Amino acid sequence: ARAALTQDTVWVCTEGQVQDLPVAGNAVIGVEAELAYELACDLPPREQPYSEADVLAAVRAAHAAIEVCDTRYAAWGVQGEWSRLADQACHGALVVGSGRADVAALQPLSVPVSLWVNGTLAVQRPAWGNPAGDPLRLLTWLANEGAHSLGGLRAGQWVTTGSCTGTVLVAPGARVMAKLGGIGCAELQCV
């Protein structure tokens, strides 16, 4: 599934910055460690499909990120697939942390991932934990098909490739850190 993220729900942090994230209006606070790609070039719809190499050449950097899940419904996790999609795929916020620019050398399927809550390890994966598979394959699909209704992908956009850890529910006041080995770290404080 894909859903466009609105600019007011994306926070891009500098190296070492902990993002204060307002959560007073959240129905739930679910956190997930994710890999986010920052695009340097447009990938408009075209007749000839983009190759993985084409897509990789359009990426400025790969970053560690935390997606904060929320719902606009009264209850969490009881909606069907179409209702979840209408709920912006349960997106609440995206906090983008540090990253690396040499994406051609990156092997995301072998990246260790950890998610920390209040200094305690909540989830650890020795390698990529997203059941959808290779994030570059997902990004290539998005460039070739998934983003056509949005006019393609554009320079400056962020593309997150799904949870590596599953969703961990946290309480207001929680401090969360996602680490993607060899890529970077993202941190937030629920305020």
Show where each model-derived region lies:
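A conserved acidic, glycine/proline-rich C-terminal tail/linker
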Residues: 135-171
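Catalytic-core "active-site belt" of small-molecule-metabolizing enzymes
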Residues: 1-134, 139-140, 147-148, 175, ...
